[in-house]
From Swiss-Prot:
One example of a Gene Ontology biological process annotation: protoporphyrinogen IX biosynthetic process
Annotated pathway: Porphyrin-containing compound metabolism; protoporphyrin-IX biosynthesis; coproporphyrinogen-III from 5-aminolevulinate: step 4/4
Stored HAMAP family: URO_D
Signal peptide span: none
Reactions catalysed: uroporphyrinogen III + 4 H(+) = coproporphyrinogen III + 4 CO2
InterPro entries: UROD/MetE-like_sf, Uroporphyrinogen_deCO2ase_HemE, Uroporphyrinogen_deCOase
Protein name: Uroporphyrinogen decarboxylase
Protein EC: 4.1.1.37
Gene: hemE
Similarity remark: Belongs to the uroporphyrinogen decarboxylase family.
Source organism of the structure: Chlorobium limicola (strain DSM 245 / NBRC 103803 / 6330)
Amino acid sequence: MLKNDLFLRALKRQPCSRTPIWVMRQAGRYLPEYRAVREKTDFLTLCKTPELAAEVTIQPVDLMGVDAAIIFSDILVINEAMGMNVEIIETKGIKLSPVIRSKADIDKLIVPDIDEKLGYVMDALRLTKKELDNRVPLIGFSGAAWTLFTYAVEGGGSKNYAFAKKMMYREPQMAHLLLGKISETISAYLLKQVEAGADAIQIFDSWASALSEDDYREFALPYIKQNVQAVKAKYPDIPVIVFSKDCNTILSDIADTGCDAMGLGWGIDIAKARAELKDRVALQGNLDPTVLYGTPEKIKSEAAKVLKQFGQHTESSGHVFNLGHGILPDVDPANLKLLVEFVKEESARYH
């Protein structure tokens, strides 16, 4: 039995004594303890070494007191498992090769055997689960098909997604072929993560806001829905969070995927999101990550604002406090600790 199941209870919209908190990228460069591990190895080797991945996954639980751990990995492990070469240089960016721009390129990609190609993630999950010793839940995750598609077609990050959109608009069937292949891999990967011990799943659609509403409905949401339904069909009790960054105008469409919770960027008042969705799903978020550069007073007042905007809890509401995106690498860890402690204390009044 979990000693602290607040995170899972909030996702399932069950009564909680306070609002749980974790933050995206909580295992990362802002922590000196993470940097000490990272100095010894490169980023992808860290992801692929279960002992090290488990160590950095647990650091923020020990040091910051967050209510959930998220397995240390990267969304691009799927692209690599499908046959692409992935280079991640933390300060310089990301390079994938060969780029995928034709039917022949797509045909060369495999739908991998997850245990064979991504077994190291499952090993890290099992080890982390054991070392956490039921203190807090463990989150497994994947990138969404659209985001992984953009990396495959662009060969890295992009300002305007020209190659990805060219495929969408000129050869939509080919785009769907690639998206479908990626989505099939994501679904299998998520199921294996639950099998290995993940208590909840988050799907990250980091580049969601690059698409218009209609394009998002056509090229992104159907695949997210496939992934959510794959998890729900086999593991109905495992909560799934969808983080479609800054898709604030189509919240109800995202809720229609069948997810339990929705991650919000900081560009929307959480009160508006709650009013629109009427507690159909739990909400996660949504403090601007740069608030953590602020004074202690400012951090507290901005966090208090998010809690107040979400408002009083009912029997069917759920809120997980988080940032609207990942914590930035140059934030003072003391500021995150202050935020975590403040949210734990301040949120009780709304429950």
